[in-house]
Amino acid sequence: MARIEQARTTADPALYAAAEKALRRSLSLQPGGNSGAETGMAALAAARHEFTAARTWAEKAITSDPYNPAAYGVLADAHTQLGHYRDAERAVQKMNDLRPDAASLARASYVFELRGSTGRAAELMRRSLTAATTDSERAFAHACLSGLALEDGDARQALSEAEQGLRKAPADPALLDARARALAALGQTKQARADWQHATDIAPLPHLLLALGETHQALGHDEQAEASYTLLRAQDTLRTSAGGSPDTDAILFEADHGSPVRAVAMAEQALRTRSFVAVHDAYAWALHRAGRSEEALAHADQALALGTRNALWHYHRAAIHHALGNDQAATADLRSALGQAPALNPLHAAQARALSQRIGTQP
């Protein structure tokens, strides 16, 4: 499991192969009732974005040991990414019934975050922080609390949470990302860029590379932006050549900075195995950028159907409504996006404000 987490957080696919080799050896030595290895295989499949396989392995692990909370956690993750939100909630409840530890409470927090209940999500994440027994659990909780504060428009609280986490884990990429987003929201764009650069040096993950590239672009540093985008393309090639489905950030990158037509194809491939709200948003944006805004609207609606508070998704739907001539609906989404403006990176914030000015929306 440690190798899986290391691969997921460092973007090193070679570690997945090492983890799989160890897990399959365990299964060969104990082919039946090996809930630990089956849970590991489920986590490995989820890390590779093979969510149907993750669900199957998690169900095997639960059959082997119905009292394995970690198996219910991976099952919840798989159901979430497959778009089976009620099934995910039931799995999270079972996980918490068995062991209400940091991991269980963090998943419960995410259930409420997806539903737009950020206050309840923050409350549960604080309980997760209190229950944390490892530095990685504490770092994860602080990063999530920072993100929830941004979604609520409180950039200073977001910065405080990120900095608390970084005092214990100064090289944690998720915390560096969280601080960068908070700094950007507070207008400290150069400091934000430095944090994103540090984060990508540690873990060149797609969402970090995209944030760094778009921040360089917002600052007019086109050469540096292109360097980040080139690395993002290379990372996506590594993922897909290893059999993984396209990442949502790679789809959004392609839609905005590459070929929208290719972005549509990537999103369609991702949706075949992952009907998650973030994939619907990426597909909607790719369709819109490819000139297919009428088709895009249904997917933008699906992305926001749970009530998730996400400034970027609201901006995307606002742009789609505007393209379709429905400025009243665009105005409503822009108000949601600009009300959560701290959650937008500098490039997206500027784009949302520009759209607002074009249609006369007051934030």
How would you describe each model-predicted region?
Residues M1, E5-R8, A43, D77, ...:
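Residue-level recognition of tetratricopeptide repeat
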Residues Q6, T10-P13, R48, L82, ...:
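Structural motif corresponding to the intra-repeat A-B loop/turn of tetratricopeptide repeats
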Residues P31-G32, P66, R99-P100, T133-S136, ...:
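Short coil turns that delineate tetratricopeptide repeat
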Residues R25-S26, K60-A61, K94-M95, R127-A131, ...:
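Canonical positions in the second alpha-helix
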Residues T9, P13-Y16, F51, Y85, ...:
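TPR-repeat structural position
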Residues M1, N34-G36, A70, A103-S104, ...:
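Start-of-helix register in tetratricopeptide repeats
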Residues T39-G40, V74, R107-A108, A141-C144, ...:
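Canonical tetratricopeptide repeat
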